[in-house]
């Protein structure tokens, strides 16, 4: 969606924006920027270059790669092969990490490396400066400046960024950006307006969750993307004081191991504390000092369960083809906020439900900025135009609905294929905020049945237009909701499949135990047995009544 905003005063330059892909749903990030006479491509993470090839890409003047993640760089090698004359600019670390996206090919360095914090004139009148953006080693915030006579036009593209310091990369520094006042700011809205705990608090909670599971004698499986989060988790487990010297085996899947090897080659570009650690012991591979860390191949015969094991892998179906394939008790850790679709490749939720020796836990290790830090960055930069990309439509909508942004900036959130003109004027007219989405409905109360102690039910009917909202799929995933009072308002919350699975696991009982959890009439924590005095009531999983009927007998 793009908010049409009138701008009074003289239009100084032709700046326009055309996204070919604004997120994983489009096959990756690929953005085209027209700045003065120049046509500039910001990232190319497209799996299929067809939309780009249809737009005469041979006339592109420059390509910038913000960082090496697959959804920002996957299409660059194919693009370079077809148009080798077009320069692709990136940081040195990004150039080294990019080949990980094509593990089956020999990919020589094909990017032109730009230094940090040093403006470079790359075309007549056009300068570019790269600033470390956090999120991933080598990730860059790109500052473009075009000089046209007496006027300077400034565009900033954040790529993926994070203000917080991570284990292996320092966060984006705000001080050099303060008061830049770009004409256009293009930034990600990955986490929408969510407010997350501080990164160190997230790490503390993650370590506590790992500790709790290991104390139960269980092994841990972490399906993660191969670059970034995987190495963050391994470094955290290797260096945290609660794990130093502890007899735990860490295993890295094949693609994760390739990422670890690549990090070994960029140690000089990592934070000081990481370099100091690497001077005294290996950053990753170590079978001498606990916790041990070894690469894991497809041959499961190498997996030793003599000590508790933590397996971190992307290609986990090859490692764990079925729930019965591994001995011992296992807990699967899943991220609360998914950073890449590859976190969930072929994840078999139903298999976990069928095998009680497998449990599910979730964790939060955010590598993007939350809503609080997003607005902080915006207010420090003070742009005229604000273009949101790279996020779920509902999360982007949450950001563009903020009054503090609507009253100060011209907001845009275009879908793939929708061009946006960004006129630069000398005066700003506050845009009319979009109307809020309100869904009207009705409430019907069903009469109670005193004979069976049924308290009655309430049915809420809402307009069918609510189904068109992108949030509905997640809200209605299981068909189960929870309601609570918030002042005079009733708040409804959908129960996700993952949350329901955790509830089922926590309520499991031995099959020979006569309780509600093992009764054929136990549905969604309610009794549905017409001859039971508890019919229609919410019941505990360990409850019991005289008319119990076993699931096994049915």
Curated annotation (Swiss-Prot):
GO terms for molecular function: RNA endonuclease activity. It holds the Pfam family Lactamase_B_2. InterPro entries: MBL, Metallo-B-lactamas, RibonucZ/Hydroxyglut_hydro. It comes from the Bacteria. To M.jannaschii MJ0047, MJ0162 and MJ1236. This is Uncharacterized protein sll0514.
């Amino acid at each position: 969606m793009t908010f049409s905003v009138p701008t009074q005063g003289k239009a100084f330059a032709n700046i326009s924006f055309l996204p070919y892909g604004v997120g994983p749903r489009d096959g990756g990030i690929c953005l085209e920027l027209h700045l003065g006479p120049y046509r500039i491509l910001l990232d190319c993470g497209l799996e299929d270059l067809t939309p780009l090839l249809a737009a005469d890409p041979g006339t592109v003047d420059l390509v910038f790669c913000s960082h090496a993640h697959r959804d920002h760089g996957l299409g660059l090698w194919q693009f370079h092969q077809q148009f080798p004359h077009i320069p692709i600019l990136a940081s040195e670390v990004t150039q080294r990490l990019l080949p990980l996206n094509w593990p089956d090919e020999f990919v020589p360095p094909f990017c032109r490396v730009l230094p940090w914090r040093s403006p470079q004139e790359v075309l007549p009148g056009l300068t570019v400066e790269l600033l470390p953006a956090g999120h991933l080693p080598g990730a860059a915030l790109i500052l473009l400046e075009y000089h046209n006579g007496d006027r300077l036009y400034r565009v900033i593209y954040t790529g993926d960024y994070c203000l917080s310091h991570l284990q292996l990369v320092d966060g984006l520094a705000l001080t050099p950006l303060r008061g830049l006042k770009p004409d256009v700011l293009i930034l990600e809205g990955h986490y929408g307006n969510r407010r997350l705990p501080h990164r160190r608090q997230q790490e503390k909670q993650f370590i506590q969750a790992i500790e709790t599971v290991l104390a139960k004698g269980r092994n841990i499986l972490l399906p993660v993307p191969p670059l970034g989060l995987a190495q963050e988790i391994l470094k955290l487990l290797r260096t945290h004081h609660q794990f130093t010297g502890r007899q735990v085996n860490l295993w890295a899947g094949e693609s994760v191991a390739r990422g670890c090897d690549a990090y070994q080659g960029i140690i000089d570009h990592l934070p000081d504390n990481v370099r100091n650690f690497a001077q005294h012991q290996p950053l990753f591979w170590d079978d001498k000092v606990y916790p041990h860390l070894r690469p894991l191949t497809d041959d499961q015969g190498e997996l030793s369960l003599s000590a508790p094991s933590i397996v971190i892998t992307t290609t986990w179906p090859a490692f764990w083809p079925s729930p019965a394939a591994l001995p011992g008790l296992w807990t699967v850790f899943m991220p609360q906020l998914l950073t890449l679709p590859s976190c969930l490749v072929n994840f078999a939720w139903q298999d976990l439900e069928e095998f009680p020796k497998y449990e599910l836990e979730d964790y939060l290790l955010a590598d993007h900025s939350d809503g609080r830090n997003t607005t902080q960055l915006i207010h420090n930069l003070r742009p005229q135009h604000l273009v949101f990309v790279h996020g779920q439509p509902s999360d982007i909508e949450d950001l563009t609905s903020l009054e503090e942004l609507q009253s100060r900036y011209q907001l845009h959130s275009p879908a793939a294929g929708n061009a946006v003109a960004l006129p630069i004027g000398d005066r700003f007219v506050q845009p009319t905020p979009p109307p809020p989405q309100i869904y009207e409905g009705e409430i019907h109360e069903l009469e109670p049945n005193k004979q069976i102690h049924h308290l009655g039910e309430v049915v809420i009917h809402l307009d069918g237009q609510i189904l068109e909202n992108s949030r509905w799929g997640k809200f209605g995933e299981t068909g189960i909701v929870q309601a609570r009072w918030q002042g005079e308002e009733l708040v409804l919350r959908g129960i996700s499949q993952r949350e329901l699975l955790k509830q089922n696991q926590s309520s499991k009982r031995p099959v020979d135990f006569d309780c509600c959890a093992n009764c054929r009439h136990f549905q969604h924590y309610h009794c549905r047995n017409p001859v039971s005095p508890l019919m229609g009531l919410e019941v505990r999983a360990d409850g019991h009544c005289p008319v119990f009927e076993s699931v096994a007998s049915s």
